Amino acid sequence: RLQGDWSSDVCSSDLFYPGHTMVTAPEILFFWVARMIMMGYEFRGEAPFTQVYLHGTVRDIKGRKMSKSLGNGIDPLEVVEAFGADAMRFTIVSQCAVGTDISLDHENVEAAFANGRNFANKIWNAGRFALMSVGDAPIQPLDQLRGDLAEEDRWILSRLSHATEEATRGLERFRLHEVAERLYHFFWGEICDWYLELVKSRLNVEADEASREAARTTLVTVLDGAFRLLHPIVPFVTAELWARLPWPDGAQRPEDLIVAPWPMPADVDRDETVEADMAGFQSLVTEVRRLRKEYGVGEGQRIGLSVQGGPEGFFDSLSVRAAAVEQLARVDRIESGAGAGVGANAVLSNGAELFVPLEGVIDVERERERMQKEITRLEGVLAGVEKRLANEQFVSNAPEEVVNTARENAAQLQDQADKLREKLAGLGV
């Protein structure tokens, strides 16, 4: 009746018509979508929808459309059973760039959905840890605690405001894969990798009460916003965790996450100064970790640190964060200046120069020998590639892509050797 009678009460009401967005595949654009629009104008005098979103086609790694006849299909129910609906949804959404198809390996389903599975697990584990840390007691309203917020609190609130704005803009433009990527980076790369690590000590029951309450309220506020942003993509794990978040006394809480209002970017939380300071701090910790790994410094080994240059007040800001630097970078002292002796150097994103003394930390002579052997090996491989490129017959007769690959290989080998020579010079050679 509804299909054949456009004058029925249901069809003539404004409840279902017109819609907003039609989601469909491109192959039926002319045969179905265009005809729906024509019939809408014919019988209702207006189009049935205002926007059409054409999604890609799921294909195997050979680019073939999945079908029963080819036997290359993936049963979504089996994926849900094995990894969960959230993992499947995030994997697909993160690949659905506009104008492209989605490629999944039907012969290795675990690898195909590993990214979504790992992210869903990360959300769950981080959410559980946060819930245990903040407890069940009601939190205080954020506006009442702004004077007690630490720098990391102001930073993550500012990052939440940016993430909210970018996710909203991405959804409005149907850039779903960009939304998934941005929220992945925000939750995993900013909340988990940095903020949770920085506030762990403040969430302990022994911590100063004002600092602890500020950390609790900030963490819950950020998770509330993050779960609302992530909910359209990973609905189940976010709804479960969101329902357990503590709430301020007397605040009206939505019945469920699915009906909670979409968050709006809070201009009051934007703090470009604290974001710039935090970026320098993150760059320092990241570079120290990289140097520790490159030179084989053990996890439990504490090292010193010298910093010079960078923006005005950068070293003072590091001094304020000394405990955090020591905790995250395994550093036992931070000094101002160029540093001297045998060690490793790095330049931070803000232009500051970093020096890590290595005398007595590693076996310097052994590290010198290792680097020299690697340089000799790289020089030998490079000589072979350059000899090949010096052969006019090879350059003239070989396919262009083969010659270009050889040239790129030579440039990479030269770059690797030059970097090792710089490191070797830092060790006194």
Q: How should these model regions be labeled?
A:
Residues 120, 160, 164, 183-188, ...:
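Short amphipathic alpha-helical coiled-coil/interface segments
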Residues 244-429:
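C-terminal low-complexity, glycine/proline- and small-hydrophobic-enriched intrinsically disordered tails
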Residues 1-10:
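Single conserved hydrophobic/aromatic residue that forms the stacking wall/gate
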Residues 28-45, 285-291:
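Metal-dependent nuclease catalytic cores in nucleic-acid-processing enzymes
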Residues 93, 118-131, 151-163, 181-202, ...:
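Core structural elements
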Residues 60, 137-168, 196-286, 306-311:
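Acidic, turn-prone loop/beta-hairpin segments
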Residues 23, 107-113, 162-183, 226, ...:
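Extended, non-catalytic structural segments that build the interaction scaffolds
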Residues 58-62, 66, 70-147, 247-253, ...:
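Catalytic adenosine-cofactor/nucleotide-binding cores of aminoacyl-tRNA synthetases and other
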